[in-house]
Swiss-Prot record:
PROSITE patterns assigned: DENN
Gene: AVL9
Keywords for the protein's UniProt record, in alphabetical order: Endosome, Membrane, Methylation, Phosphoprotein, Transmembrane, Transmembrane helix
Record's protein name: Late secretory pathway protein AVL9 homolog
Taxonomic source organism: Homo sapiens (Human)
Keyword Glycosyltransferase: no
């Protein structure tokens, strides 16, 4: 069966690339102890050698603080080997067992407990499905009490590759283990703030321990974006690392010259002499210079051979050398002026006619899209086939190209990856961490999400204002919370029903993002956009994912209502929502809330004390009254002539 699942070149053909066992050595730390097939072709199954791109694998598979838990699960992402291909999705189950319980105790086991992790490296993001299978196998592997018995791991590899395929992404099983219901119950209306925060491509750090809660919350947020889990993460772990800024000196010479870009005049287009487009591929993973390859992306029959190129052609300037001050210069490939050019609509018509000439598979996701900037007042026609996201999109342009061009998604970050947070080649990230050192470095992120407390710490006051939900947004969030909380006790729902269930919540966010995108295409749309937040939409239009989406046409959006799903007149209930939101999120509101809780507690305690005091006084008064009445009835005549003596 192994031959059946592997091609003639020895490359695995199934979705599962490797089964790996990672252990903790008392001297060497975390290390790979077994891999099937071997991580390095030609090495043995017990080789400790790692590919350079996967050097952090042991620290991801056996995360920080693993010794504090008997067992747990972690999701992580690895970059592709040699810069080719897509993200590798890792799912790891780790356990620990007492050393004295082992049937075969190896010489290097010197501690009382043994920690090991079994992980699957897959080409498909089937987190929950692989986790369910892996937990069973890991339990059986530990029950053997002899870690040299690896036959069960080989069987796991063969079984997964024979039972899983690309069709696994089409059903709901891709969302197995990712529960938006639990997310809404925990974060309530703040879920929409998280959604918008990622739309803006900000640096977002999730923090909680244990790691299973961390990766579950982070990936569940991403599952709210249509198509993101299935097709939007193929480029989420790729970036262009650079050892030091001093190496940038060599990059200036390797920048593509002006001749590497295409410009066409009106006359050129009329003669259909488009020729061959040259594309520039950026070097990946330590390559200091850009590689230039010439490939015919589209060919048109040449009817004007022998003509010399026009010397008056304007050329697109090459991207500037990256620097800490402008780390996004290499990633942004569309000039903002394109969005504002009044003649763009006419130019787009020509560009859209050429779009179907670009085979989707012919342009790698890491290549720079082919674009030609508009030349104002030159009479030239601009060829804009559309920015290429490299993702498999639907008719609405989903998933959005958020996790592309250096914007990373790292469900779990090991401490050894800390440098990525400050790397100038990383545009941003959505990352998870369990180590408190990440949380303390607040200057390296735009927002820290405290999952345990359902708290979102946004450091920049301007960003807080920008993400402040509108009245329509608050209605939308309240609508979600009410439907989820009303059905939370339904034993038959369990997240699988429709209204208030997981699929229903994802459908609501799909309606929201579709309406938002449709609203941005409307003319005179200021009033419509105000329901989404005018400043938010303005900031979003400057992001890479929106520019890529807006540079291509999506006719299906013409059928979408651009109005906010919860637009309407302001009412008293809106005032209550706004007050509730302010109390829960503003610093002053939190203080007021804490004071109210403290005051309420003190009132209750004081009431009990007063009750006890009043009760005692009433009993004493009752006794005194009874005694007085008794005295009054027995000596009436005496009490009428002279008052009884009263003791002080």
């Amino acid at each position: 069966m192994e031959k059946a699942r592997r091609g003639g070149d020895g490359v695995p053909r199934g979705p599962v690339l490797h089964i790996v066992v990672v252990g903790f050595h008392h001297k060497k730390g975390c290390q790979v102890e077994f891999s099937y097939p071997p991580l390095i072709p030609g090495d043995g199954h017990d080789s400790h050698t790692l590919p350079e791109e996967w050097k952090y694998l042991p620290f991801l598979a056996l995360p920080d603080g693993a010794h504090n838990y008997q067992e747990d699960t972690v999701f992580f992402h690895l970059p592709p080997r040699n810069g080719n291909g897509a993200t590798v999705f890792g799912i790891s189950c780790y356990r620990q067992i007492e050393a004295k319980a082992l049937k075969v105790r190896q010489a290097d086991i010197t501690r009382e407990t043994v920690q090991k992790s079994v992980c699957v490296l897959s080409k498909l993001p089937l987190y929950g499905l692989l986790q369910a299978k892996l937990q069973l196998i890991t339990h059986a592997y530990f029950e053997e009490k002899d870690f040299s018995q690896i036959s069960i791991l080989k069987e796991l590899y063969e079984h997964m590759n024979s039972s899983l395929g690309g069709a696994s992404l089409e059903g709901s099983q891709v969302y197995l283990g990712l529960s938006p219901r639990d997310l809404v119950l925990h974060f309530r209306h703040k879920v929409l703030i998280l959604f918008k925060l990622i739309l803006l491509e900000k640096k977002v750090l999730f923090y909680i321990s244990p790691v299973n809660k961390l990766v579950g919350a982070l990936m569940t947020v991403l599952s709210l974006f249509p198509g993101m889990i299935e097709h939007g993460l193929s480029d989420c772990s790729q970036y262009r690392p650079r050892k030091s800024m001093s190496e940038d000196g060599g990059l200036q010479e390797s920048n593509p010259c002006a001749d590497d870009f295409v410009s066409a005049s009106t006359a050129d287009v009329s003669h259909t002499n488009l020729g061959t487009i040259r594309k520039v591929m950026a070097g990946n993973h330590g390559e200091d210079a850009a590689m230039k390859t010439e490939e015919p992306l589209f060919q048109v029959e040449d009817s004007s051979k022998g003509q010399e190129p026009n010397d008056t052609n304007q050329y697109l300037k090459p991207p500037s050398r990256p620097s800490p001050d402008s780390s996004e210069s290499d990633w942004e490939t569309l000039d903002p002026s394109v969005l504002e050019d009044p003649n763009l609509k006419e130019r787009e018509q020509l560009g859209s006619d050429q779009t179907n000439l670009f085979p989707k598979d012919s342009v790698p996701s890491e290549s720079l899209p082919i674009t030609v900037q508009p030349q104002a007042n030159t009479g030239q026609v601009v060829l804009i086939p559309g920015l290429i996201s490299g993702l498999e999109e639907d008719q609405y342009g989903m998933p959005l190209a958020i996790f592309t061009k250096g914007y990373l998604c790292l469900p779990y970050m090991a401490l050894q990856q800390h440098h990525l947070l400050s790397d100038v080649t990383v545009r941003g990230f959505v990352a998870g961490a369990t180590n408190i050192l990440f949380r303390q470095q607040k200057h390296l992120s735009d927002a820290i999400v405290e999952v345990e407390e359902a708290l979102i710490q946004i450091h920049d006051p301007e960003l807080r204002k920008l993400l402040n939900p509108t009245t329509a947004d608050l209605r939308f969030a309240d609508y979600l919370v009410r439907h989820v909380t009303e059905n939370r006790d339904d034993v038959f729902l369990d997240g699988t029903g429709w209204e208030g269930g997981d699929e229903w919540i994802r459908a609501q966010f799909a309606v929201y993002i579709h309406a938002l995108l449709a609203a941005t295409l409307q003319l005179d749309n200021e009033k419509i956009l105000s329901d989404y937040g005018t400043t938010f939409v303005t900031a979003w239009k400057n992001t890479h994912n929106y520019r890529v989406w807006n540079s291509n046409k999506h006719p299906a959006l013409a059928e979408i209502n651009p109005n906010h799903p919860f637009q309407g007149q302001y009412s008293v209930s809106d005032m209550k929502l706004r007050f509730s939101h302010s109390v829960q999120n503003s610093e002053r509101g939190k203080k007021i809330g804490n004071v109210m809780v403290t005051t309420s507690r003190n009132v209750v305690q004081t009431g009990k004390a007063v009750g006890q005091s009043v009760g005692g006084a009433f009993s004493s008064a009752k006794t005194a009254m009874s005694s007085w009445l008794s005295t009054f009835t027995t000596s009436t005549s005496q009490s009428l002539t002279e008052p009884p003596d009263e003791k002080p």
